[in-house]
């Protein structure tokens, strides 16, 4: 297993991180336990969770993914073998079951970390991340930016001050951001530098062959500021496995179960996926192998977060990271570039 430094810390994390957002919804706790056992056996010791998981977020299942991990820690005693990441939810009018509607203020962050620590059955988090911004900006695939400063809500300096307090208390070892913009990332970095607060060590954003916006602006920040990308959705909600080619939606698949996961459910995405499928086939690879290998070979990527709903998927995904794409294959992905008009 290949490992990379988490930002400017002395923590080595694997190029593969274990995503957990299906545990408690598409996967049972027992299946989550099996995935954690197997991941560790393969050297994958970086687990990424969130207080709102599993997805889609519901009051009935809120926090269940963290509970699954916490019970596994209690059963196995392997907390110290894992670099554990979780997230505090940003502002959302649709999640009133979370503290009446989550915010990134000091009191909300305090309640969030206390809840996560209890559910995870641990006394510290290795990486605590802001799941999405408080302010009115673009994330989760939103296009067409509109500027509404009056709707910004809790300012970044207040959020970072609260996070820094958790670091000072030892409840959190490092902090990161997620679903952020170049401006947001630089604001966190500026405030940390000016006020002597903890610096963000990672940014967890979407990155895959169908969604490469990170390369514009954020990739340079990641490399110059040592804030590596934790790439989520490297298979684009499973679209880049090829299983949806031809408009098929297999029973039990994410796109069949949940209509809200429609970011890549379009004719353009289908055409791009089909083109990538042919490139992979020409080079003796599965589409999954090529898609994952492409992401992890980017110099700005620290770790690629993979999730699976069954063990065969997990094995295939981990195996894919043993593949190194030749320059010719990478060049073909750039030359084809069916993503120019995509998400």
Regions found by a protein language model. Give the residues of each.
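N-terminal binding-site loop/beta-alpha segment at the start of enzyme catalytic domains
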Residues: 1-86, 123, 162
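Short, acidic/polar
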Residues: 28-39, 105-118, 189
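Beta/alpha (TIM)-barrel catalytic core signal, keyed to glycine-rich beta->alpha loops juxtaposed to Asp/Glu
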Residues: 133-328
């Amino acid at each position: 297993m290949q490992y990379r430094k988490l930002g400017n810390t002395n923590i080595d994390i694997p190029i593969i991180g274990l995503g957990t957002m299906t545990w408690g919804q598409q996967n049972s706790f027992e299946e989550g336990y099996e995935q954690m056992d197997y991941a560790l056996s393969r050297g994958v010791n970086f687990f990424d969770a969130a207080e709102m998981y599993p997805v889609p977020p519901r009051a009935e299942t809120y926090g269940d993914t963290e509970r699954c991990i916490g019970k596994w820690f209690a059963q196995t005693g392997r907390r110290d073998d894992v670099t554990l990441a979780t997230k505090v939810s940003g502002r959302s009018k649709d999640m009133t079951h979370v503290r009446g509607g989550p915010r990134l203020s000091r009191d909300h962050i305090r309640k969030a970390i206390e809840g996560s620590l209890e559910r995870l059955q641990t006394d510290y988090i290795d990486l605590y991340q802001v799941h999405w911004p408080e302010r009115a900006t673009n994330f989760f695939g939103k296009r067409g930016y509109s500027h509404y400063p009056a709707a910004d809500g809790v300012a970044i300096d207040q959020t970072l001050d609260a996070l820094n307090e958790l670091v000072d208390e030892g409840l959190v070892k490092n902090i990161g951001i997620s679903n952020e913009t170049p401006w947001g990332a630089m604001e966190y970095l500026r405030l940390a530098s000016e006020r002597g607060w903890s610096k963000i060590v990672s940014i967890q954003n979407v990155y895959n062959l169908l969604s490469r916006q990170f390369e514009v602006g954020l990739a340079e920040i990641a490399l110059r500021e040592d804030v590596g990308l934790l790439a989520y959705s490297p298979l684009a909600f499973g679209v880049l496995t090829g299983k949806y080619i031809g408009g098929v939606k297999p029973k039990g698949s994410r796109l069949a179960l949940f209509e809200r996961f429609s970011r890549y459910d379009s004719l353009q995405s289908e055409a791009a996926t089909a083109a990538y499928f042919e490139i992979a086939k020409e080079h003796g690879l599965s589409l999954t192998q090529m898609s994952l290998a492409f992401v992890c070979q980017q110099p700005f990527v620290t770790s690629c977060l993979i999730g699976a709903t069954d063990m065969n998927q997990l094995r295939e995904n981990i195996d894919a990271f043993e593949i190194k794409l030749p320059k010719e294959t990478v060049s073909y992905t750039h030359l084809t570039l069916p993503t120019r008009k995509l998400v």
